[in-house]
């Protein structure tokens, strides 16, 4: 008999089954107000194109994100449109160009919602995707184009699709 190891991120997710045969994304408006999505979309679009890091932090805080002092979200970073209030970015962390931070995921027969916690002094390379429910520990480094589908321990050096521990000469080379 095979034993499955549950990814700790799954314990932090709220899972809701789709009520009928339609895919869960069709029902998005039942999970979040369309007016909230319009407001968040406008502010996220403005933040994605702003060159000012201080202005970006302010805009992201306006939509409910917790953004630490001196956290730097690069050009085109996209936080979750529906639930940005579930995202926390620690002080002095860097999130690279065109990274997507998701606090929700719609699947065929269910949707999942969960917090994303990025610790202090974290470096996330360009074009990464962070899935809902993950925790990235203080001082961790994530290489570009990585899929973060599980927790990253403090100080870890990870990368890939999905993320895995990297040896020192693999990171950011």
Predicted regions and their residues:
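Structural signal for interior beta-strand "rungs" in well-ordered beta-sheet cores
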Residues: 66-67, 71-166
């Amino acid at each position: 008999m095979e034993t499955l190891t549950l990814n700790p991120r799954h314990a932090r997710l709220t899972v809701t089954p789709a009520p009928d045969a339609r895919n869960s994304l069709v029902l998005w408006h039942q999970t979040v107000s369309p007016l909230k999505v319009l407001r968040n979309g406008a502010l996220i679009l403005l933040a994605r194109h702003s060159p000012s890091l201080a202005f970006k932090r302010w805009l992201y805080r306006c939509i409910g994100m917790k953004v630490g002092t001196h956290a730097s979200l690069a050009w085109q970073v996209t936080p979750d449109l529906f639930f940005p209030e579930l995202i926390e970015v620690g002080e002095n962390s860097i999130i690279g160009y065109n990274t997507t931070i998701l606090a929700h995921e719609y699947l065929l027969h269910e949707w999942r919602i969960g917090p994303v916690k990025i610790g202090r002094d974290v470096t996330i390379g360009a074009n990464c995707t962070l899935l809902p429910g993950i925790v990235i520990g203080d001082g961790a480094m994530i290489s570009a184009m990585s899929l973060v589908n599980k927790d990253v321990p403090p100080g870890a050096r990870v990368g890939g699709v999905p993320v895995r521990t990297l040896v020192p000469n693999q990171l950011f080379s």
